């Protein structure tokens, strides 16, 4: 009987060995759980601004924010932006702007983004110019100061210590970047040729990477970095450069090619950075493709008039007067208001997207299909 038991046991040894081998060979990314980011830190321009520029200067006028918040919150949309949907996907609150000193809660992160921000240091800034003084380098400096101050507040204790991130959140958080659009726009409206704007891209990307490195050196490890969208589909470009050659869908072809070149160089630089920063999980997020698909097949998503801004007044693209601004026509004050149903439009104000469009783009980048490496949002803490 003992002999037979030994025979039976020996028959099972190969199977046990096989199971152990399979478990050992399986890549860790498939064996581990989804990322549970306790906080988000955001850097960039208007696409991810939740009120930074508004805190420093003034909020965009009504009807900005009308769809979801029913008031202007400093977001450049009729409602929520992609960053809001990302936060909610992790059951985190909407991010408070770093610059907002009243009513802010930084327990689960902070937003350093500011509408009108650039990667390169701008020459013409608000209030006299059009660009934000809070370039990416300034946002990095603000983040560095934020870390320093949270340590001080944490040591002091008290009620304010309950409104800041825990110390280990900085290394466990998701770091989101969405910037670069304004660097390209400066060239377009600065009378540069397409070739001249393209020539500035390598320098812009190099500065981008340097700032990402700086933030990595402060403890950031999980990076979710958006490329830029199709600039040539924006009504503000179509209206100001009417002679631009259009593609078959109506977008300004050469301006989109600049966006694609920027994305190519950024993706290339991030691949190199990924190989150099062994502790970092760096995901390049292709925003261009899902945004462009809205213009190539608007009916699929329930949109109409893809190149006409929902909020504005006058002209072919409804941006003769900016959203929320007013104009006197024959003694009558006309306020540039919202279209009847923003959920049927892609573009909100000539530049920025509606909440409806933002939600669709979010749902597509969420899966990782458009990302490099192809990692979904809930796996963005892992290297692949």
Swiss-Prot record:
Enzyme Commission number(s): 3.1.1.-
Keywords, alphabetical: Glycoprotein, Glycosidase, Hydrolase, Lipid degradation, Lipid metabolism, Nodulation, Signal
Signal peptide (residue range): 1-31
The keyword rRNA-binding is annotated on this UniProt entry: no
InterPro entries (UniProt xref): GDSL, SGNH_hydro_sf, SGNH_plant_lipase-like
Protein's cellular compartments: Symbiosome
Known glycosylation sites: 105, 191, 198, 276, 330
Domain of life: Eukaryota
Glycoprotein found in the keyword field: yes
List of catalytic residues: 46 (nucleophile), 349, 352
Top enzyme category: hydrolase
GO biological process per UniProt: lipid catabolic process; nodulation
GO molecular function: alpha-L-fucosidase activity; hydrolase activity, acting on ester bonds
Entry's induction text: Accumulates within 5 days in response to Sinorhizobium meliloti inoculation leading to nodulation. Repressed in nodules exposed to nitrate.
Tissue-wise expression: Expressed in root nodules (at protein level).
GO cellular component, one term: symbiosome
The protein's role, per its UniProt record: Has lipase and esterase activities. Probably involved in root nodule physiology.
Family: Belongs to the 'GDSL' lipolytic enzyme family.
PANTHER family assigned to the protein according to its UniProt record, in alphabetical order: GDSL ESTERASE_LIPASE ENOD8, ZINC FINGER FYVE DOMAIN CONTAINING PROTEIN
Name of the protein in its database record: GDSL esterase/lipase ENOD8
Lineage: Eukaryota, Viridiplantae, Streptophyta, Embryophyta, Tracheophyta
């Amino acid at each position: 009987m003992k002999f037979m038991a030994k025979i039976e046991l020996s028959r099972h040894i190969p199977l046990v060995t096989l199971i152990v081998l399979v478990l050992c060979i399986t890549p860790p990314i498939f064996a581990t759980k989804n990322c549970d980011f306790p906080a988000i830190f955001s850097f960039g321009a208007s696409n991810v601004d939740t009120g930074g520029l508004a805190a420093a200067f003034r909020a965009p006028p009504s009807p900005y924010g009308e769809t979801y918040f029913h008031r202007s919150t400093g977001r450049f949309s009729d409602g929520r932006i992609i960053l809001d949907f990302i936060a909610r996907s992790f059951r985190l609150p909407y991010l408070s702007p770093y610059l907002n000193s009243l009513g802010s809660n930084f327990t689960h992160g902070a937003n350093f983004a500011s509408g009108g921000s650039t990667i390169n240091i701008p020459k013409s800034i608000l209030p006299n110019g059009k660009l934000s003084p809070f370039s990416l380098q300034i946002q990095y400096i603000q983040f560095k100061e934020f870390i320093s101050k949270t340590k001080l507040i944490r040591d002091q204790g008290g009620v304010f210590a309950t409104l800041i991130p825990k110390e280990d959140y900085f290394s466990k958080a998701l770091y989101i970047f969405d910037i670069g659009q304004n660097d390209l726009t400066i060239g377009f409206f600065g009378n540069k040729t397409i070739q001249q704007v393209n020539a500035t891209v390598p320098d812009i990307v190099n500065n981008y990477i340097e700032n990402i490195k700086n933030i990595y050196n402060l403890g950031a490890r999980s990076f979710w970095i958006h490329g830029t969208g199709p600039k040539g589909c924006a009504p503000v470009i179509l209206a100001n450069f009417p002679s631009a050659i259009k593609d078959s869908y109506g977008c300004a072809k050469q301006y989109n090619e600049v966006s694609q070149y920027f994305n190519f160089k950024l993706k290339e630089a991030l691949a190199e950075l990924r190989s150099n920063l062994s502790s970092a999980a760096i995901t390049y997020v292709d925003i261009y493709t899902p945004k462009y698909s809205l213009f190539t097949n608007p009916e699929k998503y329930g949109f109409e008039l893809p190149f006409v801004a929902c909020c504005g007044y006058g002209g072919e693209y409804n941006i003769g007067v900016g959203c929320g601004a007013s104009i006197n026509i024959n003694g009558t004050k006309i306020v540039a208001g919202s279209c009847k149903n923003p959920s049927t439009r892609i573009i909100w104000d000539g530049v920025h997207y509606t909440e409806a469009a933002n939600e669709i783009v979010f749902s597509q980048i969420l899966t990782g299909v458009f990302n490099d490496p192809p990692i979904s949002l809930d796996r963005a803490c892992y290297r692949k």
